[in-house]
Regions:
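Fold-core signature of tandem repeat domains
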Residues: 65, 76-78, 82-87, 104-106, ...
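Short N-terminal segments immediately surrounding and downstream of signal-peptide cleavage
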Residues: 57-74
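Residue-level structural signal for beta-strand termini and adjacent loop
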Residues: 28, 137, 239, 330, ...
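Bacterial Sec-dependent N-terminal signal peptides
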Residues: 1-43, 47
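Sec/Tat signal peptide C-region and signal peptidase I cleavage site
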Residues: 50-56
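Extracellular beta-strand/loop-rich repeat segments of large surface/secreted proteins
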Residues: 472-482, 490-514, 526-626
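Short, intrinsically disordered N-terminal pre-domain segments
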Residues: 2-4, 56-59
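Beta-strand-rich solenoid/repeat architectures in extracellular/passenger domains
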Residues: 70, 86-99, 116-118, 137, ...
Length: 626
């Protein structure tokens, strides 16, 4: 239909149910907030109360329309300028569906300014059209083949950038969603949503999805950018709490506390990892020219590859001998290739896992670094610094120097001169021997085997027994608190407790020649202990839970809680002498002798009875002899 155009006039096509045809109705364009007159045809339609189907509004080149609302499948075709329009129709059939009708159409040469797109609303920006300062919220959407500048996506607001389309300066707020399709471009996007469920949570309904190109994106806390296999992102800045998932290409990413995950088939180049940033290269993923700065972390999983890495002082490398990593660190060139690691530096959260059949040479383990050598793996020329962590068992082969310069070795079922710092762990397998082991806050697990020389537990140390372990030498505890738990420790050795703090023996069967309590406190909890406790005054011995002590005590302060038992035998090496006895359990005098009766005695300086019992147990034949 040919329509005449007058100055400052636009036209509506209205379906007339009486005539069965469209009626052309004119409406003066709005200016300065004043509404123009509405054609009589519109008024007649309202008066008849007949249903009115979709109407089309045409804004011609050179014309400007201010305000107005589009509803009920209305269309506004903008070849001029539309300012301040509210769009609430066009998406009734679902996001970005070709079956939708209605909405605002920005044609080539047309401009839409300050548009608000609400629930079920759709703004379509055609090639050559421009939309600026658009707010899309509550499930509304914007479809781009043209240009959109400074769009804001709120509360399920969506933006679809098609091939040839460009979005500049989009802000994606909570539950907003931007999709960049193949051939589309988004620049300067700010992403504030998509990662609320945590790192790499299964969340594909918000954030930025890149199948085309994204440039100069900023990802803030809770923000997420997902790069599809067809997508590419350049110059991305990721802050703490934000992350980037890469199935395609990511170039020149800067991690300022944020995370980057490179998946199978994905590629990341020129990534800069600053403090608290974290780049993860998964199996099949590839990274090149990554730089790790102080407190940054690069993690390369088994099957992942990172080349030309620059690891600066204080940067962390986390990998295994099943990955491929090459680069430089403060020692020079390093590599992890084909199951062989060389010249690796581990610090500040760095870690190297040496798998069975693989090797590592010249590994430096400093504060916060961890070297984990699995059963069947080998690490030679290891240099342990203060705060370095070693994880190994007696089935591995490890040799090097401790932080104090002493040489240590694990191999052939024998461990010599190990020093386990806080976080370190060593497992002694059945039939193997550990000699002169020092545990400084680490964990020593014995699954049988033997302790030889002097085994030292310092503050924070734990010795866990599984099965029966033999100690024929000395187990000594120095300053601080330590724990001996589980299993059984047998043999003709002795336990020496010195320094302040508490040694707790829990759920353990302890059979030793003697226990020397020189300083501090010895707590026996739910354990069976067969030995004499030779103590110094001022120390304390506590029997708790269901503990049974078979042996004499001389002299110390003793506490028996309800359920604990102290059996005083007549063959003890010393008489039992107690300074302060707090007694709520059971004390029994027992005899293992035959022949003439030999009395046993208990001397107590101060007794605090708490419904405990003291009883004699003698053999009837002994009673008859006396």
């Amino acid at each position: 239909m040919l329509m005449k155009r007058h100055l400052n006039t636009c036209y509506r096509l209205v379906w007339n149910h009486i005539t069965g045809a469209f009626v052309v109705a004119s409406e003066l364009a709005r200016a300065r907030g004043k509404r123009g007159g509405v054609a009589v045809a519109l008024s007649l339609a309202a008066v008849t109360s007949l249903p009115v189907l979709a109407a089309d509004i045409v804004v011609h080149p050179g014309e400007t329309v201010n305000g107005g609302t589009l509803v009920n499948h209305d269309n506004q075709f903008v070849s001029g300028t539309a300012d301040g329009v509210t769009v609430s129709t066009g998406l009734e059939l679902g996001p970005d569906s070709d079956e939708n009708t209605g909405g605002q159409w920005i044609n080539a040469g047309g401009t839409g300014r300050n548009t608000t797109v609400t629930a079920n609303g759709r703004q379509i920006v055609q090639a050559g059209g421009t939309a600026s300062d658009t707010v899309i919220r509550d499930g509304g959407g914007q479809s781009l083949n043209g240009l959109a500048v400074n769009t804001t996506l709120d509360n399920r607001g969506e933006q679809w950038v098609h091939g040839g389309g460009k979005a500049a300066g989009t802000i994606i707020n909570q539950d907003g969603y931007q999709t960049i399709k193949h051939g589309g471009l988004a620049t300067g996007t700010i992403v504030n949503t998509g990662a609320e469920g945590g790192p790499e949570s299964e969340n594909v309904s918000s954030g930025q999805m890149v199948g085309g190109t994204a440039e100069s994106t900023t990802i803030n806390k809770n923000g997420r950018q997902v790069i599809w296999s067809s997508g590419m992102a350049r110059d991305t800045l990721i802050y703490a709490g934000g992350d980037q998932t890469v199935h395609g290409e990511a170039h020149n990413t800067r991690l300022e506390g944020g995370n980057q995950y490179v998946h199978n088939g994905g590629t990341a180049t020129e990534t800069l990892i600053n403090r608290d940033g974290w780049q993860v290269i998964k199996e099949g993923g590839t990274a090149a020219h990554t730089t790790i700065n102080q407190k940054g972390k690069l993690q390369v999983n088994a099957g992942g590859k990172a080349s030309d890495v620059t690891q600066n002082t204080g940067g962390a490398l986390v990998t295994s001998s099943a990955a491929t990593v090459t680069g430089t660190n403060r020692l020079g060139a390093f590599s992890v290739v084909a199951g062989k690691a060389d010249n690796v530096v581990l610090e500040n959260g760095g870690r190297l896992d040496v798998l069975s059949g693989h090797t590592a040479t010249n590994t430096r383990v400093d504060d916060g670094g961890t070297l984990d050598v699995r059963n069947g793996g080998a690490a030679t020329t290891v240099s342990m610094g203060n705060g370095g962590v070693l994880l190994a068992d007696s089935g591995a082969a490890v040799s090097g120097t401790r932080s104090d310069g002493t040489a240590f070795r694990i191999g052939g079922g024998q461990a010599d001169a190990l020093m386990l710092e806080k976080g370190s762990s060593f497992t002694l397998n059945a039939g193997d021997t550990a000699t002169d082991t020092t545990v400084n806050g680490g964990l020593f697990t014995a699954r049988g085997g033997s302790l030889a020389g002097t085994t030292t537990l310092n503050n924070g140390a734990t010795l866990t027994l599984s099965g029966k372990t033999v100690n024929n030498d000395t187990l000594t505890i120095h300053e601080g608190d330590a724990l001996l738990q589980g299993g059984a420790l047998t043999g003709n050795g002795r336990v020496e407790k010195s320094g302040s703090g508490t040694l707790t023996v829990s759920n353990t069967t302890l059979i030793q020649k003697t226990v020397n309590l020189n300083e501090g406190t010895l707590t026996l909890n739910d354990s069976t202990v067969t030995t004499d406790v030779i103590a110094q005054r001022g120390t304390a011995l506590k029997l708790t839970g269901s503990t049974v002590l078979n042996g004499a005590i001389d002299p110390t302060n003793v506490t028996l809680t309800s359920g604990a038992t102290w059996n005083i035998p007549d063959n003890a090496t010393v008489q039992s002498v107690v300074d302060d006895l707090s007694h709520a359990g059971q004390i029994h005098f027992t005899s293992t002798r035959t022949g003439k009766f030999v009395p046993a005695t208990l001397k107590v300086k101060n007794l605090n009875g708490q419904n405990g019992t003291i009883s004699l147990r003698v053999r009837p034949d002994m009673a008859q002899n006396n």
